[in-house]
Amino acid sequence: MSRTDDPGVAGLQVYIVGGAVRDGLLGLPAGDRDWVVVGATPEDMARRGFIPVGGDFPVFLHPRTKEEYALARTERKSGRGYKGFTFYTGADVTLEQDLQRRDLTVNAIARTPQGELVDPLDGVADVRARVLRHVGEAFAEDPVRILRLGRFAARFGDFSIAPETMQLCRRMVEAGEADALVPERVWKEVSRGLMAQAPSRMLDVLARAGALARVMPELHDDAAVRAEIDRAAAAGLPLAGRYALLCRHTPERDALGRRLRAPVECMDQARLLPLAVDALAASASTAAQLDLIERCDALRKPERFDALLQAAAIVAPVDLSAWRARVQAVRAIDAGAIARQCAGDPARIKPALRQARLQALGGA
């Protein structure tokens, strides 16, 4: 059912906005569609069965498709940081006013249900020219937009950033706007940037803006780090592995993880990766192999260890098949049987178990 014959929106002015329009112009697969509604009130939406889900401003779920519909709105800066905004969603707000509040011109394009583009800010031209450009000076009112710019640069590797946009980001950082960012928002954008096709571009944007030292002051950022996270992206590593490589040269990786409130899985990988890389490079002895397996808790968490090896393989070659066989061989040992053999002399259990594991590795 198209929006032209959908009774839920019949008589409403609705437009697809933002990323779905941009990605369609780029020939990319369509993701979730966001809709903006012009000329309606919350009461109008409720009468049609739309489900309110918005917090700061009216957003509704379509009663059948569950797609998001937001009332057109304007916003005004009323405080510091990304939460310091007052929103207005009156029925008199126009589509052009709603588009004007958006971050980048490529994200400020709307499309009617019939497919007609509404582009008052020349976003289509910037899509074609592969340029990320801020919509207006209101960009400076929300420091999250610096992070989003970095994330979009990482996602769209062939896009450049307009010089005036980068200059504006620098002024924002110098004015202290980036200092108002909270960890949850930083992590949300950084993690999405790490999962993009060229994560190093995010670091480049944040560093050039002066924001990297503000939001991740512990991070050691250099060419090696950037090359490794890009190789991790090309290899399709999951987030934990990419984050571990990001932090590999950072002595204060635990402090960085706490600052960002990174997930436990990411912090564990960041802590263990330097151990794994050093151990893999140092020795091929069975004792060294067992030490690594035990220190990384590979017997209880083989999937995590496998992911760790894949991250280590970004740094130096790793025989993943051989290591998987080693872990499997050690896990196959019957620790209970060894304990029974040492009945009456518990002190013998630990060395006997280690000896059995070494023998298993020797035959793996």
UniProtKB/Swiss-Prot annotation:
It comes from Bordetella parapertussis (strain 12822 / ATCC BAA-587 / NCTC 13253). It is an enzyme of class 2 (transferase). It comes from the Bacteria. One of its GO terms (biological process) is tRNA 3'-terminal CCA addition. A single active site specifically recognizes both ATP and CTP and is responsible for their addition. InterPro entries: CCA_bact, NT_sf, PolA_pol_head_dom, PolyA_RNA-bd, tRNA_CCA-adding_enzyme. Catalyzes the addition and repair of the essential 3'-terminal CCA sequence in tRNAs without using a nucleic acid template. Adds these three nucleotides in the order of C, C, and A to the tRNA nucleotide-73, using CTP and ATP as substrates and producing inorganic pyrophosphate. tRNA 3'-terminal CCA addition is required both for tRNA processing and repair. Also involved in tRNA surveillance by mediating tandem CCA addition to generate a CCACCA at the 3' terminus of unstable tRNAs. While stable tRNAs receive only 3'-terminal CCA, unstable tRNAs are marked with CCACCA and rapidly degraded. Belongs to the tRNA nucleotidyltransferase/poly(A) polymerase family. Bacterial CCA-adding enzyme type 2 subfamily. Keywords: ATP-binding, Magnesium, Metal-binding, Nucleotide-binding, Nucleotidyltransferase, RNA repair, RNA-binding, Transferase, tRNA processing. It catalyses: a tRNA precursor + 2 CTP + ATP = a tRNA with a 3' CCA end + 3 diphosphate; a tRNA with a 3' CCA end + 2 CTP + ATP = a tRNA with a 3' CCACCA end + 3 diphosphate. The lineage of its organism: Bacteria, Pseudomonadati, Pseudomonadota, Betaproteobacteria, Burkholderiales. The gene is cca. Pfam families: PolyA_pol, PolyA_pol_RNAbd. PANTHER family: MULTIFUNCTIONAL CCA PROTEIN. NCBIfam families: PRK13297.1. Mg(2+) binds at residues 32, 34. This is CCA-adding enzyme. One of its GO terms (molecular function) is ATP binding. ATP binds at residues 19, 22, 102, 148, 151.
